[in-house]
Amino acid sequence: MIFVFGDSHAGKFGADKRFTLCGPPAPTAYGLANEKNKSESLFLLRQMLHEVEQNDIILFVLGEIDCRVHVFRQHVLTGKSYAEICAGIITRYGRILLAVRNDNNCEIAVLDVPPAVKQGNEYEYDFYGSRNERASIAEEFNSQLETFCKENGVCFVKLHPHISDEWGWLKEEYSVDDVHVSEEVVPIVVQELQKCFPNL
Protein backbone atom coordinates (compact mmCIF):
# COMPACT_ATOMS: atom_id res chain seq x y z
CA MET A 1 0.00 0.00 0.00
CA ILE A 2 1.17 3.51 -0.80
CA PHE A 3 -0.17 6.23 1.48
CA VAL A 4 0.02 9.74 0.06
CA PHE A 5 0.26 12.52 2.63
CA GLY A 6 0.29 16.04 1.34
CA ASP A 7 -1.29 19.14 -0.08
CA SER A 8 -3.84 19.47 -2.89
CA HIS A 9 -1.35 18.12 -5.44
CA ALA A 10 -1.68 14.75 -3.72
CA GLY A 11 -5.28 14.55 -4.89
CA LYS A 12 -4.17 13.49 -8.36
CA PHE A 13 -3.28 10.04 -7.01
CA GLY A 14 -6.81 9.28 -5.89
CA ALA A 15 -7.85 7.62 -9.15
CA ASP A 16 -5.09 5.00 -8.87
CA LYS A 17 -6.04 2.11 -6.57
CA ARG A 18 -2.43 1.68 -5.46
CA PHE A 19 -2.64 4.95 -3.54
CA THR A 20 -4.52 5.91 -0.39
CA LEU A 21 -4.84 9.64 0.20
CA CYS A 22 -4.52 11.46 3.49
CA GLY A 23 -3.86 15.06 4.27
CA PRO A 24 -5.37 18.31 5.49
CA PRO A 25 -6.22 21.28 3.29
CA ALA A 26 -3.22 23.48 2.45
CA PRO A 27 -0.48 21.96 4.63
CA THR A 28 3.08 23.22 4.31
CA ALA A 29 6.43 21.49 4.68
CA TYR A 30 7.39 24.06 7.31
CA GLY A 31 4.16 23.68 9.26
CA LEU A 32 4.33 19.89 9.44
CA ALA A 33 6.70 20.20 12.40
CA ASN A 34 4.28 22.39 14.37
CA GLU A 35 2.31 20.66 17.09
CA LYS A 36 -0.41 23.26 16.63
CA ASN A 37 -1.15 24.73 13.23
CA LYS A 38 -4.27 25.63 11.30
CA SER A 39 -4.16 22.59 9.05
CA GLU A 40 -3.54 20.15 11.94
CA SER A 41 -1.16 18.36 9.57
CA LEU A 42 1.00 16.71 12.24
CA PHE A 43 -2.07 15.45 14.09
CA LEU A 44 -3.53 14.00 10.88
CA LEU A 45 -0.20 12.41 9.98
CA ARG A 46 -0.14 10.65 13.34
CA GLN A 47 -3.69 9.45 12.78
CA MET A 48 -2.73 8.04 9.39
CA LEU A 49 0.23 6.20 10.87
CA HIS A 50 -2.16 3.96 12.82
CA GLU A 51 -3.19 2.45 9.47
CA VAL A 52 0.33 2.00 8.10
CA GLU A 53 1.73 -1.52 8.22
CA GLN A 54 5.26 -2.83 7.88
CA ASN A 55 6.63 -2.41 4.35
CA ASP A 56 3.94 0.08 3.37
CA ILE A 57 5.20 3.22 1.66
CA ILE A 58 4.33 6.79 2.60
CA LEU A 59 4.75 9.32 -0.20
CA PHE A 60 5.05 12.88 1.12
CA VAL A 61 3.80 15.64 -1.18
CA LEU A 62 4.60 18.93 0.52
CA GLY A 63 6.48 22.14 -0.21
CA GLU A 64 4.57 23.69 -3.11
CA ILE A 65 2.80 26.22 -0.92
CA ASP A 66 6.05 27.04 0.85
CA CYS A 67 7.73 27.74 -2.49
CA ARG A 68 4.82 29.61 -4.06
CA VAL A 69 4.03 31.84 -1.09
CA HIS A 70 6.11 31.69 2.06
CA VAL A 71 9.75 31.61 0.95
CA PHE A 72 9.52 34.82 -1.04
CA ARG A 73 7.64 36.55 1.76
CA GLN A 74 10.32 35.61 4.29
CA HIS A 75 13.00 36.69 1.84
CA VAL A 76 11.49 40.17 1.65
CA LEU A 77 10.80 40.47 5.38
CA THR A 78 14.12 39.13 6.68
CA GLY A 79 16.58 39.74 3.86
CA LYS A 80 17.63 36.11 4.01
CA SER A 81 18.47 34.31 0.78
CA TYR A 82 16.21 31.71 -0.77
CA ALA A 83 18.83 29.12 0.14
CA GLU A 84 18.82 30.06 3.83
CA ILE A 85 15.05 29.98 4.07
CA CYS A 86 14.72 26.70 2.18
CA ALA A 87 17.38 25.16 4.43
CA GLY A 88 15.34 26.05 7.50
CA ILE A 89 12.19 24.52 6.04
CA ILE A 90 13.92 21.32 5.00
CA THR A 91 15.53 20.92 8.42
CA ARG A 92 12.08 20.96 10.03
CA TYR A 93 10.44 18.85 7.32
CA GLY A 94 13.31 16.38 7.34
CA ARG A 95 13.09 15.87 11.08
CA ILE A 96 9.51 14.65 10.71
CA LEU A 97 10.32 12.50 7.69
CA LEU A 98 13.06 10.62 9.52
CA ALA A 99 10.98 10.24 12.66
CA VAL A 100 8.16 8.69 10.63
CA ARG A 101 10.51 6.22 8.96
CA ASN A 102 12.49 5.29 12.04
CA ASP A 103 9.58 5.02 14.46
CA ASN A 104 7.12 3.15 12.26
CA ASN A 105 9.20 0.57 10.39
CA CYS A 106 7.87 1.72 7.05
CA GLU A 107 9.34 3.08 3.84
CA ILE A 108 9.04 6.73 2.91
CA ALA A 109 9.40 8.63 -0.33
CA VAL A 110 9.40 12.35 -0.98
CA LEU A 111 8.01 14.00 -4.10
CA ASP A 112 9.77 17.12 -5.29
CA VAL A 113 7.99 20.45 -5.67
CA PRO A 114 6.28 20.99 -9.04
CA PRO A 115 7.34 23.79 -11.39
CA ALA A 116 6.18 27.37 -11.00
CA VAL A 117 2.61 27.90 -12.18
CA LYS A 118 0.72 30.70 -13.89
CA GLN A 119 -1.30 31.78 -10.88
CA GLY A 120 -0.67 35.38 -9.96
CA ASN A 121 -1.35 37.02 -6.63
CA GLU A 122 -5.04 36.14 -6.65
CA TYR A 123 -5.20 35.91 -2.86
CA GLU A 124 -3.58 39.34 -2.49
CA TYR A 125 -0.61 38.28 -0.38
CA ASP A 126 1.43 41.20 0.87
CA PHE A 127 4.52 39.81 -0.90
CA TYR A 128 4.36 37.46 -3.89
CA GLY A 129 7.20 36.59 -6.22
CA SER A 130 7.11 36.73 -9.99
CA ARG A 131 6.90 33.48 -11.90
CA ASN A 132 10.66 33.56 -12.49
CA GLU A 133 11.31 34.18 -8.81
CA ARG A 134 9.04 31.32 -7.82
CA ALA A 135 10.78 29.06 -10.34
CA SER A 136 14.13 29.90 -8.74
CA ILE A 137 12.75 29.14 -5.29
CA ALA A 138 11.39 25.77 -6.41
CA GLU A 139 14.73 24.89 -7.99
CA GLU A 140 16.59 25.76 -4.78
CA PHE A 141 14.12 23.89 -2.60
CA ASN A 142 14.26 20.75 -4.74
CA SER A 143 18.05 20.82 -4.86
CA GLN A 144 18.32 20.96 -1.08
CA LEU A 145 15.56 18.40 -0.58
CA GLU A 146 17.28 15.97 -2.94
CA THR A 147 20.55 16.39 -1.05
CA PHE A 148 18.80 15.72 2.25
CA CYS A 149 17.19 12.57 0.85
CA LYS A 150 20.46 11.24 -0.56
CA GLU A 151 22.28 11.85 2.71
CA ASN A 152 19.60 10.06 4.71
CA GLY A 153 18.70 7.18 2.41
CA VAL A 154 15.25 8.51 1.55
CA CYS A 155 13.66 7.87 -1.84
CA PHE A 156 13.52 11.19 -3.71
CA VAL A 157 10.93 11.21 -6.48
CA LYS A 158 11.87 13.55 -9.33
CA LEU A 159 8.79 14.82 -11.14
CA HIS A 160 9.92 18.41 -11.81
CA PRO A 161 12.37 17.63 -14.66
CA HIS A 162 9.69 15.69 -16.55
CA ILE A 163 7.05 18.42 -16.50
CA SER A 164 8.96 21.72 -16.56
CA ASP A 165 9.97 23.82 -19.55
CA GLU A 166 13.27 25.60 -20.12
CA TRP A 167 12.26 28.42 -17.73
CA GLY A 168 11.35 26.06 -14.90
CA TRP A 169 7.64 26.61 -15.44
CA LEU A 170 4.95 23.95 -15.53
CA LYS A 171 4.30 22.70 -19.08
CA GLU A 172 0.76 23.36 -20.29
CA GLU A 173 0.07 19.69 -20.99
CA TYR A 174 0.56 18.86 -17.31
CA SER A 175 -1.59 21.68 -15.95
CA VAL A 176 -5.21 21.20 -14.98
CA ASP A 177 -5.68 24.81 -13.85
CA ASP A 178 -3.41 27.71 -12.94
CA VAL A 179 -2.08 25.92 -9.84
CA HIS A 180 -2.36 22.14 -9.94
CA VAL A 181 -0.71 19.39 -11.94
CA SER A 182 -2.95 17.01 -13.88
CA GLU A 183 -3.46 13.26 -13.47
CA GLU A 184 -0.99 12.83 -16.33
CA VAL A 185 1.81 13.03 -13.76
CA VAL A 186 0.78 9.85 -11.92
CA PRO A 187 2.44 7.35 -14.32
CA ILE A 188 5.64 9.40 -14.16
CA VAL A 189 5.62 9.33 -10.36
CA VAL A 190 4.99 5.57 -10.35
CA GLN A 191 7.90 5.08 -12.75
CA GLU A 192 10.17 7.14 -10.48
CA LEU A 193 8.99 5.29 -7.38
CA GLN A 194 9.84 1.98 -9.02
CA LYS A 195 13.47 3.05 -9.17
CA CYS A 196 13.45 2.86 -5.36
CA PHE A 197 10.87 0.10 -4.95
CA PRO A 198 11.16 -2.29 -7.94
CA ASN A 199 8.36 -4.54 -6.71
CA LEU A 200 5.83 -1.73 -6.72
Residue ranges and their predicted role:
Residues 2-92:
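Conserved SGNH/GDSL esterase-like catalytic core that processes O-acyl groups on lipids
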Residues 146, 155, 172-200:
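Histidine-centered active-site loop/cap adjacent to the catalytic His
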Residues 77, 81-88, 129-140, 177-181:
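Alpha-helix N-cap and loop-to-helix initiation/capping positions
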Residues 92-110, 140-157:
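A structural motif corresponding to the C-terminal end of an alpha-helix
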Residues 112-114, 151-171:
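Acidic carboxylate-rich catalytic motifs and surrounding loops in phosphoryl-/glycosyl-chemistry enzymes
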Residues 118-158:
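Substrate-gating cap/lid alpha-helix
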Residues 68-82, 119-129, 170-174:
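Surface-exposed, active-site-proximal loop segments in enzymatic domains
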Residues 61, 111-112:
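Alpha/beta-hydrolase-fold catalytic nucleophile elbow
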